[in-house]
A protein has these predicted regions:
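Adenosyl-5′-phosphate
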Residues: 1, 173-174, 309, 326, ...
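Cysteine-centered catalytic environments shared across enzyme families
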Residues: 1-296, 323, 439
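Conserved glycosyltransferase catalytic-site signature
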Residues: 83-87, 102-105, 306-314, 332, ...
Length: 492
């Protein structure tokens, strides 16, 4: 986890103005700051140093590479001291290499004459951009950009189950850049990589073959993603976090309990060995505490709580001692985990999932085309674009960044995604949801597959402490939508 910033302006900007923006970005990279400055261009990186040496940052160069990422398979690509060295050479000499990298990445490369930048195709790390007649700003987060420009809100409709945003933000002139797209001197160029190219169904396989393939793949991916330093898991007692625990049994565990909301998280000790219980932080959250942390989240990130679950993510990152935090992000969308998938009336006209029902028609047609007209598979892919890329992934990244934590999401690893995207429908949804993951879970915990409510929050119950008013509808979700919008627009 690092923070990156690039500013290009026609009029000279004083260095203190740039450093003020870097101060906002500092939590993403608390170890040290590096930057290059001229009258017209400022480029910087705040560094969270996890493992390896810092030799790359100490070498003198005329160019500048600002990087936020982790290439888990970097050792496959040659004798590089760190993944940063590999990413730098790829950005400088051969950007096609990024399509072979497994892991999240966002980078900006400035050689003194030309600037190029890009983000990973799965939408895990990202860049925001503001541009007008005088200035262009590219940054890991919105908040530093707002130190340069007038803070003007724009309305972003809340139309899906969560407050999903693709390229738009609730700030005038600030956009999120397209995943996998290369930008050269701020002009969109070719796609470096994209998840559409990852969809290529293979030969028919049996359930046993699929389960064996996942077992081998999961072990390998988790081995490569495991850092040499201590790590933590955002631990709920559910299938996804327990699969991560099976590969990281010594990890620090952080469980957030929205009191009275999730019956599974209150039983997490049943899944754990005695030594693992000693690694567990169990944090019950009251209505007042929820409201307090909700306001802190909005104040730091300058973005809305797009989901009621964001406060739990915020508290997990805040209370984690380890610098690396593993999450189960994207497992439900990729492997068919939501209960609603068993009941949707699938149709080719549009997505009928509550997570993406108001999605862009052109994107829906592209999802349909990727699966040769199969509306079921297209719906899950549409949910990935809206619920993961448009909500959870950027939310998790900026939340982790606020507390100097690097978030690792193994279900968004390229190999795992390719496996999931090409699973036949019956191995995503049948008499149960996400059967592949549940079968894997049952190998370790044969008697503990509990019905899980999922992440929850106290947003509605915390309303008296959130300092906003709404017009009650009698529908908790409609009331939550008012809470999410009013807390952001009336306080920003």
């Amino acid at each position: 986890m690092c923070g990156i910033l690039y500013v290009e302006s026609r009029t000279a900007r004083p260095l203190p103005q740039h450093l003020a923006a870097v101060d906002v970005l500092q939590s993403r990279g608390p170890d040290f700051v590096r930057y290059q400055h001229s009258d017209r261009v400022f480029i910087a990186q705040t560094v969270l140093h996890i493992t390896g040496t810092a030799d790359f940052y100490n070498q003198s160069r005329t160019d500048f590479f600002a990087y936020n990422g982790e290439i888990y398979n970097y050792r496959w690509h040659g004798r590089y001291s760190t993944d940063t060295e590999l990413a730098y050479q790829a950005a400088r000499d051969n950007r096609n290499r990024f399509q072979y990298f497994e892991g999240p990445w966002a980078w900006i490369y400035w050689n003194g004459d030309c600037v190029t930048y890009a983000t990973d195709p799965q939408g895990e790390h990202y860049l925001y951009r503001y541009q007008d007649h005088d200035i262009v700003i590219v940054c890991s987060e919105v908040a530093p950009i707002l130190t340069y420009v007038q803070n003007v809100n724009v309305d972003v409709p809340y139309t899906n189950k969560c407050w999903t945003m693709q390229t738009q933000t609730p700030w005038q002139g600030i956009e999120r850049l397209e995943p996998g797209r290369l930008y050269i001197d701020h002009v969109p160029d070719r796609s470096i990589d994209n998840i559409w190219s990852w969809i290529s169904p293979g030969p028919i396989r049996t359930q046993v073959q699929i389960q064996e393939e996942f077992d081998s793949l999961w072990t390998r991916v988790m081995r490569e993603m495991t850092p040499a330093c201590s790590a933590a898991i955002s631990y709920s007692g559910g299938v996804d976090s327990n699969l991560i625990l099976s590969q990281l049994p010594q990890s620090e565990l952080v469980s957030i309990s929205m009191t009275g909301k999730d019956p599974v998280v209150d039983r997490v000790e049943e899944f754990l060995q005695p030594e693992q219980i000693s690694n567990l932080k169990f944090l019950p959250v009251s209505f007042e505490q929820y409201a307090e942390q909700y306001h802190a989240l909005l104040e730091r990130t300058k973005m809305p709580a797009q989901s009621w679950s964001f406060v739990g993510k915020w508290m997990a990152a805040k209370h984690t001692e380890s610098r690396v935090l593993f999450t189960g992000l994207a497992a439900d969308e990729l492997f068919g985990g939501y209960g609603v998938y068993q009941h949707i009336e699938y149709s080719t006209d549009r997505s009928h999932s509550p997570y993406s029902q108001a999605g862009d028609p052109e994107l829906w047609q592209r999802c349909l085309s990727a699966y040769n007209g199969d509306a079921r598979q297209a719906t899950l892919l549409m949910d990935y674009w809206y619920q993961v890329v448009g909500c959870d992934a950027p939310g998790q990244d900026r939340i982790g960044g606020a507390w100097g934590k690097e978030t690792r999401n193994p279900f968004m690893n390229k190999r795992i995604m390719q496996f999931a995207l090409n699973l036949p429908w019956e191995f995503k949804v049948n008499t149960t949801t996400k059967p592949v993951l549940k079968n894997q879970f049952l190998r370790e915990w044969p008697n503990l597959l509990l019905p899980k409510q999922g992440f929850a929050g106290h947003a509605n119950d915390a309303l008296p402490w959130l300092n906003v008013t709404i017009e009650p509808t009698g529908d908790r979700h409609q009331d939550w939508k008012q809470i999410a919008q009013n807390t952001f627009y009336r306080n920003s």
